[in-house]
């Protein structure tokens, strides 16, 4: 359990560094850069795009330590510049709680059948042409598995790929407990009720932590895509309530991660389309659009190489 907590917290700090890097490159007003809890989403997609490109040429295991350390360096810069606004103790408490209750979770069937294998292929080998010909299950091209492949570290019998899924859940509950500008808003109420449902369902279910929480401790994608769907809907409501560019940015990136994590969540794309077109809320100089197009292109190319199909 302590390994799980330490690994997740270290990766969390590294992701904050990549969040700073992302905002430094993409933000329209660099003098207004401030890193908060939800900005970790930027860090996640930055690591994923680096991994997607790198895996065309090398196995991700070759750069795992480098990527982690670079993120830590940028995180230290945010501390030096005092541009980070996160309750680190609060995040640690929530993370420790989930690491504790998920410690005894076992592996599910899907993990052994194909999740671990798809992670292994990205971690140990550069991209393989026609990988799905070996097994149709290898056609799963989840960006979350790419993310896990980057941060795959093994210490004795402990392997980080089994526990990193706890991070998105921690981000969700941190926002519920520590967000101070959401009171009495529908967006916050939606987020709060989503958290209550997850906890209540876990208590009601007769077997261990319930069907949903029993998935944790596995390198699966169902719970991760679920969390990003909840966050995407939250950002969608925030866009309607406050009409701020930062929430549209988060909505767009969160939706992309959600879809590319599990394609069955593709309906989430309706949220950013609605805000951008139906609501007529246009935002100027959005470099994030160019990034999103580039990210999608790389993901489609990877799909085509693995399966001869773009999706």
Where are the regions that the model predicts?
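Membrane-interface alpha helices of multi-pass inner-membrane proteins
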Residues: 51-55, 247-263, 267-274, 294, ...
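Membrane-embedded, hydrophobic transmembrane alpha-helices
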Residues: 1-84
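Membrane-lumen/periplasm interface segments of specific transmembrane helices
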Residues: 103-106, 147, 286-311
């Amino acid at each position: 359990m302590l390994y799980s907590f330490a690994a997740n917290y270290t990766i969390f700090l590294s992701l904050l560094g990549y969040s700073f890097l992302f905002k430094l490159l993409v933000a329209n007003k660099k003098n207004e850069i401030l890193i908060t809890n939800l900005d970790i989403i930027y860090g996640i997609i930055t690591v994923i795009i680096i991994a997607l490109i790198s895996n065309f040429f090398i196995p991700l295991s070759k750069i795992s330590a480098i990527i982690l350390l670079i993120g830590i360096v940028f995180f230290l810069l945010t501390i030096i510049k005092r541009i980070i606004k996160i309750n680190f103790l609060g995040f640690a408490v929530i993370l420790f709680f989930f690491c504790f209750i998920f410690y005894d979770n076992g592996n599910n069937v899907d993990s052994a059948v194909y999740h671990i294998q798809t992670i292994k292929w990205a971690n140990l080998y550069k991209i393989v042409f026609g990988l799905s010909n070996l097994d149709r299950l290898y056609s799963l091209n989840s960006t979350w598995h790419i993310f896990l492949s980057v941060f795959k570290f093994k210490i004795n019998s402990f392997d980080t790929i089994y526990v990193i899924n706890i991070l998105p859940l921690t981000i969700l509950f941190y926002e519920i407990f520590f967000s101070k500008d959401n009171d009495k808003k529908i967006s916050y109420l939606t987020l709060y009720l989503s958290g209550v449902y997850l906890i209540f369902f876990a208590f009601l279910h007769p077997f261990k932590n319930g069907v949903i929480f029993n998935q944790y401790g596995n390198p699966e994608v169902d719970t991760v895509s679920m969390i990003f769907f909840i966050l995407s809907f939250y950002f969608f409501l925030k866009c309607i309530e406050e009409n701020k560019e930062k929430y549209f940015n988060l909505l767009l990136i969160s939706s992309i991660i959600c879809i590319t994590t599990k394609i069955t969540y593709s309906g989430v794309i309706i949220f950013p389309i609605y805000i951008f077109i139906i609501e007529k809320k246009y935002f100027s100089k959005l470099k994030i659009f160019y990034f999103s197009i580039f990210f999608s292109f790389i993901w489609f190319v990877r799909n085509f190489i693995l399966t001869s199909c773009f999706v």
